[in-house]
A protein has these predicted regions:
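Acidic two-metal-ion nuclease catalytic site recognized across multiple nuclease folds
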Residues: 134-157
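Conserved NTP-handling cores and scaffolds of large molecular machines
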Residues: 83-87, 115, 136, 140-144
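Charged alpha-helix within mobile-element recombinases
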Residues: 110-116, 122-138
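Generic amphipathic alpha-helical segments used as scaffolds and interaction surfaces in large
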Residues: 35-39, 119-123, 144
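Mg2+-dependent endonuclease catalytic cores in nucleic-acid-processing enzymes, primarily RNase H-like
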Residues: 1-114
Length: 157
């Protein structure tokens, strides 16, 4: 279950930028007590993952985004399928669209602007709100893979 999906920019100079990122993540962790926080860890964001997980003790897991972003089974296209299956409910009232950050309007706008090219890949920039939701989806997918699956066999002689 996704409780909160955040995307945005944190402004600070030099070392303050990293500290501001970790402080922001700590505040969200205190508010929601998540079992896992999935963060895109391409480039410099790897340092954020390390600082939040190893130094601040937050349940942060990094994901290095690659070609799987375009795949229908684990990529951003999976979000469309989950929405068709009614596994997502996006709040849409004045309070939700105006009072939240980044706001449900940005998420809906981002999802509606996704364009798939003839090669079956996303074209152009993927909006931050959509990437944040995909990070949530990846965390859920990873949790389901790690759960113990077993089959019960009944044998009648």
């Amino acid at each position: 279950r996704v409780l909160y999906s955040w995307s945005g920019k944190i402004y600070a100079k030099g070392q303050g930028w990293l500290e501001a990122q970790v402080v922001s993540m700590k505040e969200l962790a205190e508010r929601f007590n998540p079992s896992k926080v999935m963060v895109e860890s391409n480039g410099y964001q790897r340092l954020v993952v390390h600082a939040a997980a190893d130094l601040a003790g937050l349940p942060v897991v990094g994901h290095n985004t690659g070609r799987e972003k375009h795949r229908h089974d684990v990529g951003i296209p999976l979000i469309a399928l989950k929405m068709e299956q009614e596994k997502y409910a996006i709040p849409w009232n004045k309070e939700a669209t105006e009072g939240s950050r980044p706001g449900t309007r940005k998420l809906v706008d981002g999802l509606s602007r996704l364009i798939y090219g003839k090669n079956g890949r996303l074209e152009g920039h993927t909006p931050d709100a959509v990437m944040a939701l995909w990070m949530c989806e990846l965390a859920i997918h990873e949790d389901h893979k790690q759960k113990l699956n077993y089959t019960k066999w009944d044998y009648f002689a």
